[in-house]
A protein has these predicted regions:
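N-terminal transmembrane signal-anchor/hairpin module of polytopic inner-membrane proteins
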Residues: 1-91, 246
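Transmembrane alpha-helical segments of multi-pass membrane transport proteins and ion-pumping complexes
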Residues: 11, 15-19, 85, 155-163, ...
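Hydrophobic alpha-helical transmembrane segments and immediately flanking/interface helices
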Residues: 73-80, 94-103, 214-226
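Core segments of transmembrane alpha-helices
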Residues: 76-83, 124-131, 181, 226-231
Length: 250
């Protein structure tokens, strides 16, 4: 029953993430879901706040201009619902369940915005870093010292990577938002999990970049958003971090 409840919560959270992903990169105050057509910008009523509701209303098309909805809307809502529904199977402590659900929602938001806009926004990472440090006071398995050390380690390591990439590949190889994301991940995960998460994210990004280059889907000078891989690694470490750490140290 708890899984069903969290799945429904995840569906609603996915709808909220879509709103934030649409509005925050444009520096707009988050508002009700609206048509993706900038010349229309029709605001949906309560029944259309979720992709499912819009699909039931005229096949999902905007009633004002006929614009098809973003495919991302349904994928984010469905994916967040499924992921949230699985959380009670993976986490048995109520406070950890609630806080990790928030962490994962924020990381999903970062993935969406980075994929679509090549941005990792300070308005997302900086407040969440403070919250993550505060949550470390009440979460089992981590404490404030570990969270602070994790944030510092993430910040310093990725700052070093940023400068090396800048000298080697030129400006823009790695964005400053990636540095702040690494700091946020450290505050969420603590040490030593942040080290594993960063290595995992860098490895994942390198593998996928190599595949894209090999398939000639991108060129060598193309910008590839890196934050998405770091955020995916953070989600993996939130859910299975201790098991992965124990396996690596065994």
């Amino acid at each position: 029953m708890l899984n069903v409840l969290f799945g429904l919560i995840g569906l609603l959270v996915g709808g909220l993430l879509n709103v934030l992903a649409d509005d925050l990169p444009r520096r707009e105050q988050p508002s009700a879901p609206h048509c993706p057509n900038p010349e229309c910008d029709h605001v949906y009523g309560p029944a259309g706040w979720l992709a499912l509701g819009r699909r039931l209303q005229g096949g999902g098309r905007c009633p004002a201009c006929g614009q098809m909805p973003r495919r991302r809307w349904a994928w984010v809502e469905g994916g967040t619902a499924v992921l949230f529904a699985c959380l009670p199977w993976l986490i048995d402590t109520p406070i950890t369940l609630a806080v990790y659900a928030l962490f994962i929602a924020v990381l999903i938001l970062i993935i969406i915005i980075d994929l679509e806009n090549r941005l990792i926004l300070d308005v997302v990472t900086l407040p969440m870093t403070v919250l993550a440090l505060l949550f470390s006071l009440v979460l089992p398995g981590i404490n404030l010292i570990s969270a602070l050390l994790g944030a510092v380690v993430g910040l310093v390591l990725f700052l070093m990577i940023y400068w090396v990439a800048k000298v080697t590949f030129g400006p823009g190889a790695i964005g400053q938002g990636d540095i702040k994301l690494a700091m946020l991940m450290g505050a969420m995960l603590g040490v030593p999990h942040i080290l594993i998460a960063l290595m995992m994210g860098i490895f994942l990004g390198g593998i996928i970049s190599a595949v894209l280059l090999g398939a000639r889907l991108v060129t060598r000078d193309a910008y590839l958003p890196y934050g998405q891989y770091l955020a995916i690694a953070a989600i993996v470490m939130l859910l299975w971090g201790q098991a992965i750490t124990d396996w690596l140290l065994a």
